[in-house]
């Protein structure tokens, strides 16, 4: 039988108050065109509206590339991470949790009235990036000395939240979404590296650079290359290269460069392997 009927753009089913029963949260537009999250609870076999809260994105921004992620706060409380994408370029993320039985937006700015979690969209969404059981929000940051308009120049800081809405950076990554991989940036790298991209028919390389105290120019530290084409097996074992992974006919290789040798934050081949990951299909797909 029918329990309720409502218009919506996306929805989530999750036990937000940890009572063993799952609540239904639907995202819709109100009469003024604003985005609203409605939380319904089941009472006597009927879904009843418990509370509502405004969200920071329009339903158009949510419906196209947006996503609703059921996740967990640093305080081990369940939460909904609502991501909308404005103009295909800016990611806006709200973090919704129940406080005293009321749906609350933990990242709402008292000054602007919308989420403080806004940054360049890089086709990644909230997830547990490090396997600690807590959901992190991706926040893009321009690498030092780089043009903010260049997607290649963005690192991703992964931010966790507690029940009071306090943010904490957990780690930073460099995501090469176009080529299907990301690297967890080692200690000391996030504020000290920038990147360059080079392409040829069978090789696409990302080179990490740092500044040198002995030279005015930047020096290369690490290069990660995606090899395709018929010569990839031979090219993968070229002197200095080490294999990081394989996927769909592509071999990913690393190469430690001269800037790594005497640098305070130098890395080993094994450390690069441990920090390298392939991007799964779930990264770039929105859902309910």
Model-predicted segments: where are they?
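Secretory pathway targeting signatures of secreted, lumenal, and periplasmic proteins
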Residues: 186-237, 242
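Surface-exposed loop/turn elements that mediate protein-protein interactions on large endomembrane-trafficking
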Residues: 1-4, 38-58, 94-113, 158-168
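Loop/turn-rich, solvent-exposed surfaces of beta-rich toroidal or solenoidal domains
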Residues: 76-94, 186, 192
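Beta-propeller blade termini
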Residues: 9-16, 63-73, 121-131
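Surface-exposed amphipathic alpha-helical segments
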Residues: 254-288
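Conserved blade-ending motifs and adjacent loop-strand segments that build the rim/top face
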Residues: 107-127
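Structural motif
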Residues: 32-41, 88-97, 144-160
